[in-house]
Curated annotation (Swiss-Prot):
Residues 1-22 are annotated as: Disordered. The gene is mutS. PROSITE patterns: DNA_MISMATCH_REPAIR_2 (PS00486). It comes from Microcystis aeruginosa (strain NIES-843 / IAM M-2473). Keywords: ATP-binding, DNA damage, DNA repair, DNA-binding, Nucleotide-binding. This is DNA mismatch repair protein MutS.
Amino acid sequence: MTLPSDFPLEPPATNKDPHRDYRGLDRSKLTPMYQHYVEVKETYPNALLLYRVGDFFECFFQDAVIISRELELVLTSKEGGKGIGRVAMTGVPHHALERYSRLLVEKGYAVAICDQVEDSTEAAAEKRLVERAITKLLTPGTLTDEGMLNAKKNNFLAAVVITGENWGLAYSDISTGEFYTTQASDLTALSLELSRLQPSEILFPINAPDLNRILRPGEKSDHLPPCLPDSFCYSLRPQTIFTLTEAKNRLLITYKMRSLEGMGCEHLPLAIRAAGGLLEYIEDTQKANQVPLQPLKTYSISEFLILDGQTRRNLEITQTVRDGSFYGSLLWAIDRTCTAMGSRALRRWLLQPLLDSRGIRARQDTIQELKDNPALRQDIRQKLREIYDIERLSGRVGAGTANARDLLSLAASLVKLADLAALVASGNSPYLKALQQIPADLEKLGQQVIAHLVESPPLHLKEGGVIREGIDAQLDALRRDYQEVIDWFKNLETTEKERTGISNLKVSYNKTFGYYISLPRSKADFAPKDYVRKQTLVNEERYITTELKEKENIILTAVDELNKLEYEIFSDLRRQVAEFSPEIREVATKVAALDVLAALAEIAVYQGYCRPEIADGRLIDIKDGRHPVVEQSLGAGFFVPNSINLGNQEGLEYPDLIILTGPNASGKSCYLRQVGLIQLLAQTGSFVPAKSAKISICDRIFTRVGAVDDLATGQSTFMVEMNETANILNHATDRSLVLLDEIGRGTATFDGLSIAWSVAEYLATVLQSRTIFATHYHELNELASILENVANYQVTVKELPHEIVFLHQVRPGGADKSYGIEAGRLAGLPTSVIDRAMQVMGQIEKHSKIAIGLRQGIKKIKPVKSDNSPSLQQLDIFDDSK
């Protein structure tokens, strides 16, 4: 970064190290400003302190070293006082504070903003230090400023309390006011829930010297139990804040209640402790800004479909596996929402699909109604585009940080809500009915704000010019007086030219002298007697008059009074709006839900999605299903649809497990993800990319698609694969959907085949999970001849004399070739390598005995649900004695 020319750069001194820590200095020798800096820093030792000095926010000592490194700023030094020498210093311009603060917070730091809280001219006149105070404490989980937040993503702050195997979790997005808590007894479930939420910051209580320290992602600490992923940012908080009594009292006081029974957490002590500790942290970091949180809601993790981190990653729900980008994810493909709050809601829905068929059908009914009524759908979507992010706007209003533009945007949106209610008045589906009754007071409130504020208010409130004329009589009178003086100044130059006869006389202004009259030096002798000389320049003389200074004082006084009065009027208006924050946020939740469903109806129409029938039992019956992302990437008509039938149950001879074989790069992994995404979309309440679909609810989706070395934990690709597979076998049920791709490939062939066979057999006979098992071990096709609930499918190809054509069609039957050498040819391997590979493969196929005898003497077995191991008859197929 290149600093502005007026930034106080000085070369570091060579006699003393400017990078010293302040704790090793004699503070009495520091200048008064540095003494105050150190005093503030000791109050916030775990935050980076940005300290206002003129037009810059500066930092010193070790904070300067850290910030210069993280932000790539110039590290310089500044005189610290007699006998101290120079101290390390860097800084940022005041107008760039938000940008640089955001960068530091994104890197996992807490940032304390120490700003001037009085006019510097008053302090200068009294020859004292300008009064400064901490005005903001920014941490990763407590951001509210629009410029620091991702409009389409929640910024969650979480708190965790753990006792043995039991845990409590609370989380909130203070920019929207959402506040939830839960309690459970499985530490693995805690890790899954944190992985779903992806909180920006997690509070964890300890009783140790590291209190209030923030651990950046990846930073290790003995204070954190192994069950907590180290990929998050943790703030270590005092245990005393998280005691049950302290936490319960804080919740009762905050919500002005006598009991927590209405919140549903009365008998969940760990959930209460987590919620109370989180509340305390919000109060501590937000200072004078009271965050208007929504009522605390208690939920159970058993209410939703479980998606572990591996599944979310493999299904590419919010970001791609390859580069972590939004483009190419499921969310990218289906997010047609018109508002930021709708986009956030869609993300939450995708990461927390429903298990309740009634909730799913309620969403489907609304999508169906909007799909069948294109005019209504388009009118709703057009009206939604006119509505701002009222969820976060109401939060800033409630916290007292909203500016005039924020308030005007909120007001305009409140007025539009009445139009939206009118549009859905005839709706019959649940989510349309929810918006038919919008409080009339909200529209009146919006109209009141619009009537008070000018159409294009300035960004900063203290610039004035915010309130319309005719709102306040005193304000109008001050403005008239001010305008009279301004008009006098406008006419002064003409008047003085006529009075003096000096045609090149000018009336000007600067910050040093204020208003003055300028004459060329050649005309100085003609200056009237009432002109008082103030400054002589090379070609110019500058004068003032008694009347001019009197008028100037009137202007300065009037501006100050005007700005103060306008700010009072605006603040009062903002307080009135803040009283309606709960009602506004309740409506915002309904608007966001309607936005999501209208967007899903839109994509259902234009991408040809069908309404899935939510069936009882364990059924997955999809006809001509498509991958929602790949089909959009390829364009209309290019994607090859495929069907699937899974879920063996009475009256249906569908398999529980499909062995899927086929060539490399033929589309097996795409097919696996396609089935998983259709199941997920169905339980989100969305329509799905298929000709028709009949789908039962599943409790979990497991995926194991591809693996890489985990260098951080020293695990090989194969070990990562085995850990993921073990997790599936230990947690899957007959209501789960399991999608496996190439189990056992990271070890010797016999070992890999043995593991793959055993895993598939266990899934089919013991767990009876609905499973697609993609593999290049063609020997696994023999399972279908052994187990009644296993079927073979293959991704077909067309063989030509010198090449193969991928048809991307999934058909019954097992493949006996993987065409890996042909894939190598397509990738550009040298011809000599391809030819040699063909020779080697011929020899291997000729002499291999892996598959000999697999069909001999095997009677087809009907699996029986059991907690025991598969029968010996199933395992005896490898017995040499047979």
